[in-house]
Amino acid sequence: MDKNLHILCPDVPWPADYGGVIDPFYLLVQLKAVGIQVYLHCFTQNRAPQKELEKYCKEVHYYRRDKTALLSNTLPYIVKSRSSKKLLQELGKNNYPILMQGIHTTYFLYKKLLPNRKILLRPFNVESTYYQQLSALEINPFKKYFFKRESRLLKSYEKEVSTMIPILALSQTDKQFFEEQNARSYFIPVIIPWQEVSILPGTGNYCLYHGNLSVNENQK
């Protein structure tokens, strides 16, 4: 069994404070516990590098997103903006397996720049549907156009990429969607720290925020 693994993450997975980073972070914790050496590759935009990640990884690399990818008319922005040449160079230093987290990190797979590599994809959801929902709820006309355009590009992109490698879906619904795209799809539930409850002792007043309220879909 190979004890080394590259993991590509579309964001910095610490702090684990929203849905897109909870599963990636606690996967790092679990892999560390069973002796897997992880080479973590993160894209930065609004989140800074985190020393905490070094506790669980052999190496941690950070890459800036390319905002000029907005000019692309053929590829989704969430994918094209994560096409760092430095990342491709790091992946080429060895032949370790690769776990791509989120359709966001699949640019080099799509471009067939990783031949003869063992690769798995862990999509966070069906992104084309997610962006369609964002477009339907958006009031700002420019953002609405962007979300609608992104959804259209993602729909064809997801269909093509999902047939290239095995899919590790987060939900049974997503598993079924990718199976309908002729993908080899498997269901692995979200990884969370279920072994313990992290809560302050005693009683008090609490406010529960279920989801990121800066996203229109969560406000709805």
PLM regions: where:
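Membrane-proximal helix-turn-helix segments that form the acceptor-binding/catalytic region
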Residues: 29, 85-92, 126-130, 139-167
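Short N-terminal targeting/anchoring amphipathic segment
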Residues: 88-107, 118-120
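Conserved catalytic-core segment of nucleotide-activated headgroup transferases in glycan assembly
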Residues: 187, 191-220
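N-terminal subdomain of nucleotide-sugar transferases
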Residues: 1-61, 93-94
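Donor nucleotide-sugar binding/catalytic pocket of nucleotide-sugar-dependent glycosyltransferases
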Residues: 118, 147-197
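Short hydrophobic "strand-cap" motifs at the C-terminus of beta-strands
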Residues: 8, 170, 210-213
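A short, charged, and often flexible helix/loop element on the N-terminal side
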Residues: 60-87, 139-146
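Active-site proximal beta-strand in glycosyltransferases
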Residues: 114-137
